[in-house]
Amino acid sequence: MGVLDHVSEMFDCSHGHKIKKRKQLQTVEIKVKMDCEGCERKVRRSVEGMKGVSSVTLEPKAHKVTVVGYVDPNKVVARMSHRTGKKVELWPYVPYDVVAHPYAAGVYDKKAPSGYVRRVDDPGVSQLARASSTEVRYTTAFSDENPAACVVM
């Protein structure tokens, strides 16, 4: 079959055509400020007409929109921003339980909804929040629970 494969490669006409990738089913979470029912309606209608959108869920108190479907997140954000004229961004928060140190300087956000903290992809921020091994040794050396602790007092 080596000869047939070689001949079929020579006369293959599909090299000029791109094969379309099928989009994956995604859940896109978006932050957009919604003050009234009119804003909610405008946000919902801006996304519902998109090709590939299965469902749209609004949480106006948290300023959160969840879009489920076969869509590109960047296209959803661009369309919503263009159609509504509002500032739109991907959901920048993660649940409080996921973060190791939720009150670190780069993570804690006063404007975040309750139960959420800001998502930080920078590994340097998490390193600043954790204590080094020498700091841990110093704090445990003077602990009341440590029987071998310093008893100067």
Curated annotation (Swiss-Prot):
Sequence ranges assigned to domain HMA in this UniProt record: 25-89
Stored Gene3D superfamilies: 3.30.70.100
A Gene Ontology cellular-component term: plasmodesma
Result of changing residue 39 to G: In HIPP26-4; loss of interaction with HB29
Top-level taxon of origin: Eukaryota
Keywords tagged on the record: Cadmium, Cell membrane, Lipoprotein, Membrane, Metal-binding, Methylation, Nucleus, Prenylation
Pfam families: HMA (PF00403)
Physiological role: Heavy-metal-binding protein. Binds lead, cadmium and copper. May be involved in heavy-metal transport. May be involved in cadmium transport and play a role in cadmium detoxification.
Protein name: Heavy metal-associated isoprenylated plant protein 26
